[in-house]
């Protein structure tokens, strides 16, 4: 039998079976016969178009029996296992007609239509969702019949099970329709829509919002729940990749949250937008939601009064614009049409134009276009996937061989239309791979890296660059602790993290024992000693306790231990911290010649230039690799210029202006003076520093330089009162406030890691004094002080001892102090006793009489007076946030993040902010370049230049100090040689410092209440006084007895 005859025969059989269906006693059996014949006995390249046209007419029939039988046949066809590709497109094409029947008046027809919809939703090819879903959505939107709506909603729920991944991509068009159905007046529709919405959220693969999905669905139906839901999500840590499905369920909440009246809700909605959008990888993911989110953020930024909330909104706007690739004038990029059925159909029709495809195959062509559109939306580019999904339907009208060729060309053309997210090829060369993996990394409440590639080769030196808080140190520690997914284990690749500060628990351990005791080294003492000598350790140093080593030598010791572990990869976090220039040069030479792969985090641009072969840079939660050293990297990435030049930083720091110092009329006058000072630690053979002379003023810009162990930090500790000099004199102006940031800056905050920065500052200054300075040696009363304080004074003929010093007032060119007394009785006898006297017996003594015996008590009073002269600052959240913002910490970190979760650089900024809270006159920085990134270093450099007080800096970074300091203190072997100084006696020359009344800041009491200061009257000249007198006399003459004078007339 010929193909034409067979086709005619098939059509006749189907017509006969369909006509029998109407009169059959067992309709299920008759429908099953049709299904069996359709799915197995049709001739290849033939489609029973006439049968489906007849079936469509019967489904639409107003006769319930006819329609019921046709729907039963439709259900059986769809329910057959292995629905034939030549039948499936035509079955799906009738979905709209079947859905309409679900709203029929006849209950049996309604049920049959509903069951038929479920059957086709279960049987459809998953990638053909774009062929069926638009039809269902169209029916759902346009019908008024609630039974039809319920049937369609149940079918959509079934589609989620059939094609979960594909429905996830359709969520942007599905969620608005489901939301509208949830507001339907019919209870059954509301319930079905809520159930379908819940079912559709199964496509959302995002663990961050999983537990909030019930609340997200609920607030769609009940807008009053939006504020509470925003609050819940505002405290969420977002670390999972954000997909189109995730944004589909979040966008309705966020757009409503941005439109709420309450500023706090608007702010939190902006925070959520900011945090979620950072995890979007492709602009096309966020494109469908831009018209909802962007206008809301812009409107809030323009109209909100709260500056902090506006700042948060601005940050969210910047993130959304960057992620969404928003153009100039906020032109929103169009959503890609590469996956539209019209586009893919047009491409396919071009490819088969010469094949003369018959009209009856149009339905199949549209079906292929829908499948191709889904593959494009899924970013599927593999040829196997295209063949598997498209070939069964293309062979309806093409031979298999030519179909494969056409599909491959179709695939190439389709994927060329897909907009590609930014991607970068690593600049690599040949060599042995030590690591090649993909991973994500989060720290606390922050995503650091999201599905990034990481590849390392043997004998390469990599510099790891990124801003503070990007996660450089966290990545290094994660690698060392085996927490990076896919990174080789220690057995496969020995990775050693070189600590920049050895744990204090080893303080008394000798250098050689420290290395030998490490279980991973496993070497004899002789081998360890030889290696330490290779690292320039002398025999004396090898047997010294670790606490006696300077910071630089501790770094060399940690490096020596790492090398002895036979490391394949060295992880070096700020290796040049505490190293002088000689040791930095040694380290450069060692890393360049040792043959060990190293990953280096450093803020020393010169060091990175001399060592690195590749730069690994943090870019949008990815790691991108650039070949070449830092200078080569900056050429390729100009935005990273601040890594190379401190002055190129756009970040700005500001220090508060120091308060007025009584008696200091020029910036040259000494506020700190040290004469013939020396210091020696107890138990040591010689002084650590000796014969030290210097002075500091408000104009001082001093760099303290010298090799490791020369005594620089000891000198500074004496200057700031941390240590008391063994001999010599240290004068500090009575009202002078000194801010001291230690070499190990984290020492200030180590015991407060579970506080927020705001809480830490409130704790530190809650009494008005700086609680961090209370343990300084200059404030501790020792036995010698107690003996001196037993001195007996003869006051008004009675023997007295000082009980306390309470207040200070001006006395000639100095001060005198209010003293409370104890009265002596029976002095020198066994029953000697000292009785506290009443406050009315208090007297005043000059400073000179007290300094010899009660210097520390006098200093306490001076400090309180100094604080009072700076005025109390209100310890309110707003004041603290504004102060911290001057040092580069935003309000989110200051008030809403624990110190434990801050990066190293952010912690240093916090220490800077806390130490300068009391508006110091002198800022002393010990190694400020440690831990701060290049941007922050540039900002710090500019802030120090603009600071109105004095600056003393210990640093090995010539780059940092070269344009900043004028005076140099060179410390070598315990002696200090100053140069470039301009020390003066008395006030010196230069412009006078005037305390201007009109420039005084607002004053506050300790509770934060503003004190209204009375304005001082301006002194009038004699001419002005005469004029006032004439005006008074004139008024008196005019008014007579009714005249009453006022203060303003005098």
Swiss-Prot record:
Query: Pathway, per Swiss-Prot/TrEMBL?
Result: Protein biosynthesis; polypeptide chain elongation
Catalytic activity entry: ATP + H2O = ADP + phosphate + H(+)
State the family it belongs to: Belongs to the ABC transporter superfamily. ABCF family. EF3 subfamily.
The protein's matches in PROSITE patterns, at most eight in alphabetical order, are given as:
ABC_TRANSPORTER_1, ABC_TRANSPORTER_2, HEAT_REPEAT
Domain of life of the native organism? Eukaryota
Asked whether the keyword RNA-binding is assigned, the reply is yes
Instruction: Give one GO molecular function term.
Output: ATP hydrolysis activity
Q: What is this protein called?
A: Elongation factor 3
Biological role: Ribosome-dependent ATPase that functions in cytoplasmic translation elongation. Required for the ATP-dependent release of deacylated tRNA from the ribosomal E-site during protein biosynthesis. Stimulates the eEF1A-dependent binding of aminoacyl-tRNA to the ribosomal A-site, which has reduced affinity for tRNA as long as the E-site is occupied. Assists translation termination by stimulating the release of nascent protein from the ribosome by release factors.
Q: What class of enzyme is it?
A: hydrolase
Query: Sorted alphabetically, which CDD domains does this protein's record hold?
Result: ABCF_EF-3, CD_eEF3
Which keywords are on file for this protein? ATP-binding, Cytoplasm, Elongation factor, Hydrolase, Nucleotide-binding, Protein biosynthesis, Repeat, RNA-binding
Name any Gene Ontology BP term. translational elongation
Which annotated residues bind ADP? 43, 45, 86, 395, 399-400, 708, 927, 930, 956
Cell location: Cytoplasm
Provenance organism: Candida albicans (strain SC5314 / ATCC MYA-2876) (Yeast)
Domain ABC transporter residue range list: 429-646, 672-998
